[in-house]
Design a protein with these regions (language model features):
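Short, non-helical or kinked segments that cap or interrupt transmembrane helices
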Residues: 33-43, 101-114, 141-152
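Cytosolic, membrane-interface loops and tails of multi-pass inner-membrane proteins
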Residues: 24-55, 188, 192-206
Length: 206
């Protein structure tokens, strides 16, 4: 019963915190409207391309922090409960994508998802993040590297849940599948641009 009360408190709070769009805030500080420059997406990649590397990296760190903070709440308040970490992490991702402060239009949820998985699966996160940066450095296609990292994290968590079968593991599996599907859905415009050979490139170190 106590856990239920915690869920009722932290899920809405996670959504509200997730709804804070740091790309929009930082771009405004720089006298720019991130939704009307570059790809129009208020997220890390567009910030890197359109506002600057430093500001893009700052956006990434702050967006990650949203997922990290609520996954940590899931870990410590709910005592390493996998379901709680998934639920609270996903609540921040939903806030980021469907921001209540921006008419339910936000970013694509990658950085916030990575932050959550950094707490849930730190070793796998380190591998996935390294591969993502490597892919971006060599091939300059940010969204493919991002999706690759998310796929690695979600699939390894699916496998882990299937093997360990903790309490409510089947709910965890459903959440993970929905999480992955949601991230792919937010990148539907990128897939269209790839198909039309108009996807933007990004030189991370150039």
């Amino acid at each position: 019963m106590i856990d239920l009360y915690y869920y009722l408190i932290f899920i809405p709070l996670g959504y509200i915190v997730g709804s804070i769009n740091f790309a929009t805030i930082i771009a405004k500080i720089k006298n720019k409207d991130i939704k009307h420059i570059g790809s129009g997406n208020p997220g890390t990649m567009n910030m890197l391309r359109s506002v600057g590397k430093f500001w893009g990296c700052l956006t990434f760190v702050l967006d990650c922090a949203k997922g990290i903070s609520f996954a940590l709440i899931g870990r410590f308040v709910f005592k390493d409960n996998n379901l709680a970490m998934y639920v609270l992490g996903l609540s921040t991702v939903l806030g980021h994508i469907f921001s209540c402060f921006s008419k339910f239009k936000g970013g694509k949820g990658v950085a916030t998802s990575l932050g959550a998985f950094a707490v849930i699966s730190p070793i796998t996160f380190a591998v996935a993040f390294t591969l993502m940066i490597g892919y971006l450095a060599f091939f300059k296609k940010g969204f493919i590297g991002s999706l690759m990292a998310i796929c690695i994290l979600v699939i390894t968590n699916i496998v882990r849940n299937c093997l360990v079968r903790d309490n409510y593991y089947y709910v965890c599996l459903i959440l993970l599948v929905l999480w992955l599907g949601l991230i792919f859905w937010t990148h539907r415009s990128n897939f269209k641009r790839i198909k039309n050979n108009t996807e933007n490139s990004l030189s991370l170190f150039g």
